[in-house]
């Protein structure tokens, strides 16, 4: 699919979302799930967690015919617990490790903004790293720009769709977005238009719920309406 869409000048950025939102991984390998923070969190204190995730990324990135053929790879890093300082530092080290890991395959790393939520002392690489700026409480955009990240503006309060969930949008408020919003507005933070550290904007559709009557066609209608 990446090759087909690239030929049509559409870039697919594949994502393996770790170390949270990782139930697909812990269902397969329960021993790397966190007993303290829930099985959707990987246990960052176990060496086998890194062995497994390293091997998973390698499976998609290495060889003469890799699955991920584009120039960018998303490593997730969304919504991990910040309950304790030691786990925050582990999360920051994990993030830095996988930024550098995918760069080792010639890819540009993309992450979800989380480093204000996970504020700590462990350095996380920022040079040539793209960050989805989705919620300013998780990643303050001014701080992230100062730290050297390139941002994609995707503020959840304006451009998140969760079909028939009762929170966020069911359909985007397109007239408002067209008339009032630009990617320079990230939550309540406003930057100069065409700021060199803001690459552009995106919207997201998240299928948080199954069995609520929403079909693939319904999802497409929300995207293309």
Region locations from a protein language model:
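Alpha-helical scaffolding within the catalytic cores
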Residues: 55-62, 117, 138-139, 186
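Acidic, contiguous N-terminal accessory segments
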Residues: 109-118, 125
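Substrate-binding cleft of carbohydrate-active enzyme catalytic domains
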Residues: 4-105, 109
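Active-site beta-loop-alpha junctions enriched in small/polar residues
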Residues: 15-21, 78-80, 114-117, 134-136, ...
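Short glycine/threonine-rich loop-to-helix capping motif typified by GTGT followed
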Residues: 81-94, 121-136
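Flexible, acidic glycine-rich loops studded with aromatic residues
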Residues: 122-129, 136-225
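Hydrophobic faces of well-ordered beta-strands that scaffold small-molecule active sites
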Residues: 12-16, 73-75, 109-111, 129-133, ...
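Carbohydrate-binding surfaces of carbohydrate-active enzymes
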Residues: 104-106, 115, 213, 225
């Amino acid at each position: 699919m990446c090759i087909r869409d690239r030929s049509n000048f559409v870039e697919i950025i594949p994502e393996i979302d770790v170390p949270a939102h990782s139930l697909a991984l812990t269902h397969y390998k329960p021993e790397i799930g966190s007993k303290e923070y829930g099985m959707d969190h990987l246990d960052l204190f176990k060496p086998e967690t890194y062995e497994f995730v390293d091997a998973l990324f390698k499976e998609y990135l290495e060889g003469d015919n890799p699955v991920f053929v584009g120039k960018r790879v998303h490593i997730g890093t969304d919504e991990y617990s910040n309950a304790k300082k030691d786990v925050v530092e582990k999360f920051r080290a994990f993030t830095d490790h996988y930024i550098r890991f995918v760069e080792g395959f010639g890819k540009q790393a993309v992450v979800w903004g989380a480093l204000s939520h996970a504020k700590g002392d462990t350095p996380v690489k920022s040079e040539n790293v793209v960050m989805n700026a989705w919620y300013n409480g998780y990643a303050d955009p001014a701080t992230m720009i100062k730290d050297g990240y390139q941002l994609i503006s995707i503020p959840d309060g304006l451009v998140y769709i969760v079909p028939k969930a009762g929170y966020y949008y069911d359909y985007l408020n397109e007239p408002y977005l067209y008339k009032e919003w630009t990617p320079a507005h990230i939550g309540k933070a406003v930057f100069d238009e065409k700021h060199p550290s803001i690459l552009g904007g995106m919207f997201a559709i998240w299928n948080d719920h199954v069995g609520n009557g929403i079909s693939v066609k319904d999802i497409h209608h929300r995207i293309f309406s």
